[in-house]
């Protein structure tokens, strides 16, 4: 087995860079790709075409980096393309699959006599068909690489729209047979990649104040870095450190006063010129913000609504308290009414009792008067009786004395 290797030229190195983005092409054919018996018996016309094929192969070898494996006079059975280098295998050559030059990521084309399109080429031999297919494939690859390189150079010189692509008329010598959309695809530019990538909102926290910010990935950032390191902090912490120390010192000991603010177009470098310590400036700044920058601020509206809700809750609580007080006053009023009714009943009873007592007193007084009259009568009668008794007693005593004296 002989190998013919040409040195890499600048064009081949460009082909090497461009070929890294190409996809793998697999044309599956039977594993045993052996030339038929008709290919061994070549006619004079096939010999001439064979010589023309050799000259074309020599021209291609001079134009691009091509390695020929096997006997160049044998028919082309396989073709490998890897990292800008084309490997053409002629004849029956046993190649190990573990060969690093021919890994699974190579572009592989297997050719044998069964691939001949007899409808398009009814009279062509398998050798001529193999030569035509190989030359056509190599030409298409070379032309496509040239077009990709031209488009890349034009984009570097004068950037065009992402949908730009050169077009040629069908009769133009630069016309390429259309392939599938993902075949020989050129690498996308950075603008195309940014447009194709979906925007993703990511929550990132500061390592100093642990405040969480929500930014769009690869679009904007709320963090800044110094010009000497890539450790990011939030803008509030950067300003706080600058106000305290007049210079920013990162935890990696990088010291700088300048900072960089990033977005999808690049970065802006800021340098603090003057540090003025005035506590009233932030108050004035916030007064201006609240007057001019809170018209369409959803957070302010939410805060206002929340404040109104708090006031409404307080008013509801006060209303509940007033209702409770009114309920208590109503209950007290009802109790007082009940007490008043009871007092009136007590007064009526007292009046009734007083009337009854007065009546009883009058009755007792009349009874006492009657008894007094009876007593007076009895006293008079008793006095009269006593006087009568005394008189009778005196008469009896006198009579007794008289009787006694007579004895």
Swiss-Prot record:
Keyword Zinc among UniProt keywords: yes
Keyword NAD part of the UniProt annotation: no
Composition-biased stretches (Basic residues): 13-25
Coiled coil stretches, renumbered: 127-158, 336-393
Gene Ontology terms: biological process: symbiont-mediated perturbation of host ubiquitin-like protein modification
Bias kind Low complexity: ranges: 31-47, 186-196
Keywords: Coiled coil, Early protein, Host nucleus, Host-virus interaction, Metal-binding, Modulation of host ubiquitin pathway by viral E3 ligase, Modulation of host ubiquitin pathway by virus, Transferase, Ubl conjugation, Ubl conjugation pathway, Zinc, Zinc-finger
Annotated stretches, region: Disordered: 1-69, 179-200
A GO CC annotation given for this chain: host cell nucleus
GO MF annotations, alphabetized: transferase activity; zinc ion binding
Subcellular location: Host nucleus
PTM: Auto-ubiquitinated.
Superkingdom of the source species: Viruses
Ranges annotated as RING-type zinc finger: 206-254
Biased composition annotated in UniProt, kind: Polar residues: 1-10
Enzyme category, top tier: transferase
EC identifiers of the protein: 2.3.2.27
Catalytic activity: S-ubiquitinyl-[E2 ubiquitin-conjugating enzyme]-L-cysteine + [acceptor protein]-L-lysine = [E2 ubiquitin-conjugating enzyme]-L-cysteine + N(6)-ubiquitinyl-[acceptor protein]-L-lysine
Function: RING-finger E3 ubiquitin ligase that plays an important regulatory role during the initial stages of infection. Migrates to specific nuclear foci early in infection supposely to prepare the sites for viral replication by targeting and ubiquitinating host proteins.
Entry similarity comment: Belongs to the alphabaculovirus IE2 protein family.
Quaternary context: Homooligomer.
Listed name of the protein: E3 ubiquitin-protein ligase IE2
Gene behind the chain: IE2
């Amino acid at each position: 087995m002989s190998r013919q290797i040409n040195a890499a030229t600048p064009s081949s190195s460009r082909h090497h860079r461009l070929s890294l983005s190409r996809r793998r092409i697999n044309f599956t054919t039977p594993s045993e790709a052996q030339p038929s018996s008709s290919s061994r018996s070549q006619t004079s016309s096939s010999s001439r075409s064979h010589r023309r094929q050799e000259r074309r192969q020599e021209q291609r070898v001079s134009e691009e980096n091509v390695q020929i494996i096997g006997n160049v006079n044998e028919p082309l059975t396989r073709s490998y393309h890897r990292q800008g280098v084309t490997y053409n295998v002629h004849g029956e050559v046993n190649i190990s699959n573990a060969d690093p030059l021919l890994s699974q990521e190579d572009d592989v084309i297997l050719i044998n006599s069964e691939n001949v399109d007899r409808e398009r080429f009814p009279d062509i031999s398998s050798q001529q068909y193999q030569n035509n297919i190989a030359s056509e494939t190599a030409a298409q690859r070379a032309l496509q690489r040239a077009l990709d390189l031209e488009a890349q150079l034009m984009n570097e010189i004068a950037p065009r729209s992402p949908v730009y692509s050169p077009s040629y008329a069908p009769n133009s010598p630069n016309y390429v047979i259309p392939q599938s959309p993902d075949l020989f695809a050129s690498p996308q530019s950075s603008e195309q990649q940014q447009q194709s990538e979906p925007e993703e909102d990511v929550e990132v926290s500061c390592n100093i104040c642990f405040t969480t910010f929500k930014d769009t990935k690869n679009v904007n950032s709320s963090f800044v870095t110094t010009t000497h390191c890539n450790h990011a902090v939030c803008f509030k912490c950067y300003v706080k450190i600058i106000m305290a120390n007049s210079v920013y010192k990162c935890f990696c000991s990088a010291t700088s006063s300048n900072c960089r603010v990033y977005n999808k177009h690049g970065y802006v470098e800021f340098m603090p010129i003057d540090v003025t310590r005035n506590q009233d400036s932030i108050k004035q700044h916030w007064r201006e913000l609240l007057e001019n920058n809170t018209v369409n601020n959803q957070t302010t509206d939410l805060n206002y609504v929340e404040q109104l809700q708090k006031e409404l809750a307080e008013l509801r609580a006060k209303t509940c308290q007033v209702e409770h007080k009114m309920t208590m006053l109503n209950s007290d009023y009802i109790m007082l009414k009940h007490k008043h009714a009871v007092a009136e009943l007590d007064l009526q009873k007292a009046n009734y009792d007083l009337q009854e007592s007065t009546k009883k007193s009058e009755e007792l007084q009349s009874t006492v008067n009657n008894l007094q009259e009876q007593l007076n009568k009895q006293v008079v009668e008793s006095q009269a009786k006593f006087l009568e008794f005394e008189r009778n007693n005196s008469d009896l005593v006198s009579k007794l004395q008289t009787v006694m004296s007579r004895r």
